[in-house]
Amino acid sequence: MKQQQQTPELFEDFHMPITLDVSNISAYSPFLVPQDHLGHSGVFMGMSAFMLFLFIAGTAINVLTIVCTIQYKKLRSHLNYILVNLAISNLWVSVFGSSVAFYAFYKKYFVFGPIGCKIEGFTSTIGGMVSLWSLAVVALERWLVICKPLGNFTFKTPHAIAGCILPWCMALAAGLPPLLGWSRYIPEGLQCSCGPDWYTTNNKFNNESYVMFLFCFCFAVPFSTIVFCYGQLLITLKLAAKAQADSASTQKAEREVTKMVVVMVFGFLICWGPYAIFAIWVVSNRGAPFDLRLATIPSCLCKASTVYNPVIYVLMNKQFRSCMMKMVFNKNIEEDEASSSSQVTQVSSVAPEK
């Protein structure tokens, strides 16, 4: 029992948060042997298939978004820069995260070793954080353009570029510390993908403070930004709809934008809510046992965002969708369907003047 309590200090590159009736826990290293003691082979194969789907679908839809934006000039608006940034970060996670997890789940252990774990953990964290902060920037930019809190402020190319650079800076601020000694990257969940150490406490890695830093800096702040900006946007649109009660198009825009905002906020919570809740629970319940299969879910939901975020922010955007249909299937969609009635970035035409 004494040896088990020292385990977090003895192993620099992994942690086994379950009790094993063995004298040599290193023999169960997730870098050396299949983790059959953590779950049935069917669980690993199912996760492998899921990661393969995320890799293929995530790569395809995000590459399509980038290529489509390059091909069609009308998509290269300042407000769409951040959507391309989101697609790049999603593609980053698909290539460096989902593909690695697919093979690791297939082998049932992290075959790429401790160094590979640090690389995969870092790259996945960077991609995830860029995606997270990009969603906050999307909300902020739409608030600035539609609600016009700065009066006659004009959103220009430098602002759009700054909005794309900001998420990468924030991501580096979140992803670099575990490489520098504040927390660490280790296998998580079923030990087939890597991320920050949520599990261990009271050690030299100071994981508790890092988890709280991530919760505040990378969840609470972006989420508060999203809720505030979209809340203000909805208020603005309701006022515009009330002022133009006889306009069917304005009423339709308000309804569709409201649905879009609900979907956006819900999508953010699905992606990052479980991670935030799980991390806080682990820190608040030090030493409490938990099912590693359940601990895999937050990571999977974050990787799955590479597919459902483009669906929310790109495919539900009629202008993007019409261009994609034309590029892939050579099929034209009627111009009125490609209008921006459901597109938050272009509903400023119904916003009241200030």
From Swiss-Prot:
Keywords, in A-Z order: Chromophore, Disulfide bond, G-protein coupled receptor, Glycoprotein, Membrane, Phosphoprotein, Photoreceptor protein, Receptor, Retinal protein, Sensory transduction, Transducer, Transmembrane, Transmembrane helix, Vision
Segments on the Cytoplasmic side according to the record's topology features: 69-80, 141-159, 238-259, 317-354
PTM text: Phosphorylated on some or all of the serine and threonine residues present in the C-terminal region.
Native source organism of the sequence: Danio rerio
Membrane-side (Extracellular) residue stretches: 1-43, 107-120, 184-209, 284-291
Family per record: Belongs to the G-protein coupled receptor 1 family. Opsin subfamily.
Keyword Nuclease: no
CDD domains per UniProt: 7tmA_SWS2_opsin
Residues carrying N6-(retinylidene)lysine: 303
Primary role: Visual pigments are the light-absorbing molecules that mediate vision. They consist of an apoprotein, opsin, covalently linked to cis-retinal.
Pfam families xrefs: 7tm_1 (PF00001)
Gene: opn1sw2
Subcellular location: Membrane
Topology within the bilayer: Multi-pass membrane protein
Gene3D superfamilies attached to this UniProt entry: Rhodopsin 7-helix transmembrane proteins (1.20.1070.10)
Disulfide bonds: 117-194
Transmembrane intervals: 44-68, 81-106, 121-140, 160-183, 210-237, 260-283, 292-316
Entry-linked SUPFAM superfamilies: Family A G protein-coupled receptor-like
Glycosites: 24, 207
Organism domain of life: Eukaryota
Biological process per Gene Ontology, one example term: visual perception
Protein name: Opsin-1, short-wave-sensitive 2
Entry's Gene Ontology molecular function annotations: blue light photoreceptor activity; G protein-coupled photoreceptor activity
CC terms in the record's Gene Ontology section: photoreceptor outer segment; plasma membrane
Tissues where this protein is expressed: Retinal long single cone outer segments.
